[in-house]
Amino acid sequence: MNMRPPKPVALAALIGFALGAPLAASAQVVPLKEAKLNIEHNATVNDTGYQGAIDSEGWGGLTVTGPDGVILELKPQGKLATLGMTELFFETVEPENAKVPVADMLAILPEGKYKIEGPVVASLGGGTTAGTAWLTHNIPAGAVLITPAEGAKVPLGDTVMSWGAVTQTITGKPVKIIAYELIIEKVGDPDPNMIGKPNSLSMHVRPSVNEITISAAFFEAGSPYAWEILAVEESGNQTLASGKFSTE
């Protein structure tokens, strides 16, 4: 007959079962809804930086760890910290390639998996929230903007926005584009209170789409507009090309 005492884990499980205690609740691991780390390159002004996007039910702090160790720590403080944070989007400074070459920017973070994890706020049961971001150094080339032509004055009406397909990286290697993002904004000061820009639109389209017509209802007569096409490759890295036009 085995008379040795139960191992600590087994003993804890027995006590938890006897008392009806939900021991697993304190050790819950809640997957992040979103865990992304990408590169954004601007092919028009030639600068490059990193971006991240995180979404969860609620976290009290986060640590981002990659192949070379910790690259970022986030810790909310103050009155709102007790509520916990959910969504977060961040961008690094994007130095000009002439000052910091792309190769030097890529050397900051190696390719690979980046673990994003931290505590779940107590009000949501505690535990840990975690996810993994995938970073590559595949940077798409910029799309060629076709219409409207740069600096064109277009009639007020339905307007065709078109661009060339992107098939290579900035180093000439084949690239898999998974989407294009079209952004159009009326040039002007941002609203002092509204999050987001008034008189603007943003949409993602399939990689097979290189042309879309925007309704005349979006545009105002005699107004300047800026537009961008972002080519997004399969790991999430994106390159933007931008232009300007105006309406009659």
Can you annotate each of these PLM segments?
Residues 44-50, 157-161:
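Structural beta-strand segments of beta-rich domains
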Residues 105-111, 217-223:
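Surface-exposed, short loops/turns at beta-strand junctions within beta-sandwich domains
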Residues 118-120, 229-231:
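Conserved structural position at the C-terminal beta-strand
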Residues 130-144:
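Proline/serine/threonine-rich low-complexity linkers at boundaries of modular beta-sandwich domains
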